[in-house]
Amino acid sequence: IVPFDPNKVIPCCNGWVLAPYPNRVTNGQYSFDGEDYQMPIDEFDRQSSLHGYAYRYMWELVDLQESHVTLSWRSPDIAGYPFDITITATYALDENGLTETFTVHNNDSVKAPWAFGIHPWLANGKHATGQAITADNEPCRLELHCDTHVTVDEHLLPTGEEPVSGIFDLRDNPTLEGRGF
């Protein structure tokens, strides 16, 4: 677990909660329940709306204990997302490691579209960027138990999924050498 200065922006999207949608929305446009919505474009080079709004706002501290912390975020009336949801996140640390638990509650009587993701970031204790961080990470190992991964197009928008293989196969605790993560 890497601490950050609470008064500075968290680098590299580290640990961001991605809601009410993860990834990207093409041109910031979507339709839900017969209505069309327009969100601000904030990823200009890809003309998309990126990673939702939850990471952009302060979260309320609900509970702080030695072994865990619980935070909540209630969506304000946001351009392109006029829905009222609350997300609660609990981060608990024990002898088995870190457990993250998230719940979402719709505070309104109308349906609310939402999706969820997290933006994990692996830190090797060094503060390099670009090719230097790639070189520092290559001897590290990562084990991830999954059978498929999401495929993306040139704008990093999801196009489907396929079985893990080659650089995407992390089931046997390989080094990250040549994987470019």
Question: What does each model-found stretch correspond to?
Answer:
Residues 1-39:
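Beta-strand-rich N-terminal accessory domains
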Residues 75-122:
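Acidic, contiguous internal or C-terminal segments within carbohydrate-active enzymes
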Residues 26, 87-89, 138:
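Residue-level marker for the onset of beta-strands and adjacent loop->beta junctions
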Residues 26-42, 95-97, 105-109:
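Conserved SET/PR-domain catalytic core that frames the SAM/AdoMet-binding pocket
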Residues 40-95:
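Extended, loop-rich substrate-binding clefts of extracytoplasmic carbohydrate-active enzymes
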Residues 36, 68-72, 88-90, 99-103, ...:
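Beta-strand secondary-structure signal
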Residues 111, 121-181:
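Active-site/ligand-binding surface loops and adjacent short beta/alpha elements
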Residues 31, 62-63, 92, 105, ...:
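Well-ordered beta-strand positions
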